[in-house]
């Protein structure tokens, strides 16, 4: 989000912790973490507890765990149960099981019930499932939906499917719960109920895993409308493979403008340093073939030839003729004739 400037920032009294905190919080709320950090650090030096709380969130967000520990420890050790819980999370992220466990237990003993889930989750991640259940169950029975879902996973892994189902149904406002219910009913071959829960997870809670399952389901069932719907939801979250699949669909429909747009989103997204894409799932030759056709339609002939050159899809006569027709429609008759001739020898 664009930085929002506030008046008189240069005239702030450094000893005014509350004012510094409010300035930092305003920047934080408006998406400027760098400026938020600057003022929250000054407020934290004056012992402002809420400044430390937000500052720790910023450092956790950017994985600056040593800084988060530095600001949290003094106040956490003074008995603040929320900061004890957050410090437990810092140590969990640092894979320091003993200190994470210590601070979560400290927070629980000081009355912070949310730490029951966090400690249960810690035990779960370190494969201490019996201990995880000991802390998750009281939290789940107090309507902590994250605890209900994680407890259900443990019961499911232990073969206690009925117990898993019971706790998933208790988590009424949790997309992961609906996704897991869909998975559970799918394994029971109750496809109608599975689909119902998966669609709730995908459409209402924007659950990515449910969207992935559903687009594949509808692709297998030749339901193009719903396949496109769930691919579009995934694309909205920058799921790179979905751009390629949508591009392929639109290319097959001769909607080359939309196909080109989706392929371009894929190529641009793939360049990002944090891009996650499994190229094993993508038919690169088909991608280049379809993108080449889009380029012809949009008059980008050099790009077209770059993608079509030595493409394995041009070993099929009908595909060669399709490309030739596109060049003919684009009034590139010389190239069209070359493709028509080559189709005779495929």
Place the predicted regions along the sequence by residue:
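Short helix-capping/linker turns of helical repeat alpha-solenoids
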Residues: 15, 46-48, 78-80, 110-112, ...
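Flexible helix-coil transition and linker loops at the boundaries of alpha-helical arrays
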Residues: 8-13, 269-282
């Amino acid at each position: 989000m664009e930085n929002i400037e506030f008046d008189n920032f240069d005239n702030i009294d450094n000893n005014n912790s509350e004012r510094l905190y409010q300035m930092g919080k305003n920047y934080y709320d408006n998406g400027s973490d760098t400026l938020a950090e600057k003022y929250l650090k000054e407020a934290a030096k004056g012992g402002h507890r809420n400044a430390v709380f937000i500052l720790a969130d910023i450092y956790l967000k950017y994985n600056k765990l040593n800084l988060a520990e530095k600001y949290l420890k003094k106040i956490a050790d003074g008995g603040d149960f929320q900061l004890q819980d957050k410090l437990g999370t810092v140590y969990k992220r640092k894979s320091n099981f003993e200190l994470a466990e210590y601070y979560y237990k400290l927070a629980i003993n000081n009355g912070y019930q949310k730490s029951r889930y966090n400690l249960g989750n810690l035990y779960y991640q370190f494969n201490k499932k019996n201990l995880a259940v000991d802390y998750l169950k009281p939290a789940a029975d107090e309507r902590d939906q994250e605890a209900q879902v994680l407890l259900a996973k443990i019961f499911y892994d232990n073969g206690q499917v009925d117990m898993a189902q019971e706790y998933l149904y208790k988590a009424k406002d949790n997309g992961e719960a609906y996704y897991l219910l869909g998975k559970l009913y799918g394994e029971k071959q109750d496809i109608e109920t599975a689909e119902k829960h998966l669609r709730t997870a995908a459409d209402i809670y924007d659950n990515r895993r449910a969207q992935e399952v559903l687009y594949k389901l509808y692709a297998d069932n030749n339901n193009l409308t719903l396949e496109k719907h769930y691919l579009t939801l995934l694309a909205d979250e920058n799921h790179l493979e979905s751009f390629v699949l949508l591009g392929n669909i639109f290319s097959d429909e001769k909607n080359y403008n939309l196909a080109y747009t989706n392929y371009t989103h894929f190529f641009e997204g793939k360049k990002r340093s944090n891009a996650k894409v499994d190229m094993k799932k993508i038919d690169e030759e088909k991608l280049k073939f379809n993108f080449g056709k889009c380029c012809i339609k949009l008059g980008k002939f050099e790009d077209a030839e770059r993608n079509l050159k030595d493409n394995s899809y041009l070993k099929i006569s009908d595909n060669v003729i399709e490309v030739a027709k596109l060049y003919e429609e684009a009034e590139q008759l010389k190239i069209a004739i070359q493709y028509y001739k080559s189709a005779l020898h495929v």
